[in-house]
């Protein structure tokens, strides 16, 4: 069914974060964490990351946007398996990129999980929610 919901875990001093219990099963065999858009982090199940990898691999190498996106995506990607307590370790460079502090927000975003700094997530919502109804007019025709 995909990842859904909003959760509020805390980052510990070692950069570890408890994954929400409802996400653990799908990520238990491995995940890839990397930079996302809007200064969040993307967490993909390995199978989904492989699907993205194949899509980028089949794109023309002459496409500059594909090369640029792929470089940043793959250079910042880390694969790992959550520990027995269901924690993932966020590397320092990714914590810095996303501005992660102690208070984080973990959201389900269908095929991926996103990790946000709590304040950045609140700012994003304040900026985006007024346009939510208008965006639905653009998005729904593409999915129905």
Swiss-Prot record:
Keywords: Cytoplasm, DNA-binding, Repeat, Transcription, Transcription regulation. GO terms for molecular function: DNA-binding transcription factor activity; transcription cis-regulatory region binding. GO terms for cellular component: cytoplasm; nucleoid. It comes from the Bacteria. Residues 6-48, 77-120 form the SpoVT-AbrB domain. InterPro entries: MraZ, MraZ_C, MraZ_dom, MraZ_N, MraZ_sf, SpoVT-AbrB_dom, SpoVT-AbrB_sf. It is found in: Cytoplasm, Nucleoid. GO terms for biological process: negative regulation of DNA-templated transcription initiation. CDD domains: MraZ_C, MraZ_N. PROSITE patterns: SPOVT_ABRB. PANTHER family: TRANSCRIPTIONAL REGULATOR MRAZ. Forms oligomers. Belongs to the MraZ family. This is Transcriptional regulator MraZ. It comes from Acidothermus cellulolyticus (strain ATCC 43068 / DSM 8971 / 11B). The gene is mraZ.
């Amino acid at each position: 069914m995909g990842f859904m919901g909003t959760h509020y875990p805390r980052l510990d001093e070692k950069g570890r974060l408890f994954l929400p219990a409802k996400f653990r099963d799908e990520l238990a065999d491995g995940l890839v964490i990397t930079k996302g858009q809007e200064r969040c982090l993307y967490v993909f199940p390995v199978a989904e990351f492989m699907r993205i990898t194949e899509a980028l691999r089949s794109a023309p190498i002459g496409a500059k946007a594909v090369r640029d996106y792929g470089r940043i995506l793959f250079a910042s990607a880390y694969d790992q398996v959550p520990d027995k307590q269901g924690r993932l370790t966020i590397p320092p460079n990714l914590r810095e990129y996303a501005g992660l502090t102690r208070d984080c927000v973990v959201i389900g975003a269908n095929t991926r999980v996103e990790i946000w700094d709590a304040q950045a997530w609140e700012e994003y919502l304040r900026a985006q929610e007024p346009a939510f109804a208008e965006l639905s007019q653009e998005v729904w025709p593409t999915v129905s």
